[in-house]
Amino acid sequence: MSEPIRVLVTGAAGQIAYSLLYSIGNGSVFGKDQPIILVLLDITPMMGVLDGVLMELQDCALPLLKDVIATDKEDVAFKDLDVAILVGSMPRREGMERKDLLKANVKIFKSQGAALDKYAKKSVKVIVVGNPANTNCLTASKSAPSIPKENFSCLTRLDHNRAKAQIALKLGVTANDVKNVIIWGNHSSTQYPDVNHAKVKLQGKEVGVYEALKDDSWLKGEFVTTVQQRGAAVIKARKLSSAMSAAKAICDHVRDIWFGTPEGEFVSMGVISDGNSYGVPDDLLYSFPVVIKNKTWKFVEGLPINDFSREKMDLTAKELTEEKESAFEFLSSA
């Protein structure tokens, strides 16, 4: 057995965490021979609920779970971390302006970034899930200057999986038969799900998705909007936001960071845009296609970008630039 790793989940009393914690504890993310110390952070009013989650994790009697720590204190939560999964954020309330939401979250992620900087290992991998995820991730990274910015990523894997699922449903195959879809940009309704480079396995042969579907207007229209608005559709139907699918996407994202991406496959994650070859401005936290090896991601380079894609990629970059500018205003005054 190897040494235990310390894994933090914030927003640990919430519903995404409730769907996530068992998978982390049972070895589905870090492997079946990796012991784990699981640290659960939430705000003080949620500590009663968090105690219940702690009891349940104990009652799962998971062999890999060496210890579970529930806390509302950042200095306890962020100490010596190997992995931080930042799920907790201020949710958008009815009638709340996006600006107010951004301001509340800048405060949270500035504080958590500073705690990472002060207490966590410098090699910590930080995954931001709480919305607005891209800008929250950038805020945390800027507030943790001693941790390499490449160690920060935000979740767009849920959008990636949603795109795969839509293509699979349309073609009557399983999602596993679809690979190399891309989510470009922000985890918002301006994201651009791109299948120009995606492949699907049909009768044992790999075929381009455009070629397989022969329905360009669906791919450029309804497919894009369905993926962009899927989160809202789930809320409308379930009266709660996606939790099971979000937790599964977090597991996929973190497992790929830990073990690498399969040969010939790439995935989508929000990462720092510095040095990309796709004309996205530097210093944005933008979702790109990446491959991962030895716990290090690299951009997938050299994919041809058509005019339709270019326009969509620029639009979401513009939104991220505006979000970043507002956040940085709050950051300097926070």
Swiss-Prot record:
Listed name of the protein: Malate dehydrogenase, cytoplasmic
PTM comment: ISGylated.
Family the UniProt entry places it in: Belongs to the LDH/MDH superfamily. MDH type 2 family.
Gene Ontology cellular-component annotations: centrosome; cytoplasm; cytosol; extracellular exosome; extracellular space
Organism the protein comes from: Homo sapiens
Positions carrying N6-acetyllysine: K118, K121, K298
Name of the gene this protein is made from: MDH1
Modified residues annotated as Phosphoserine in this record: S217, S241, S309, S332, S333
Catalytic residues (positions): H187
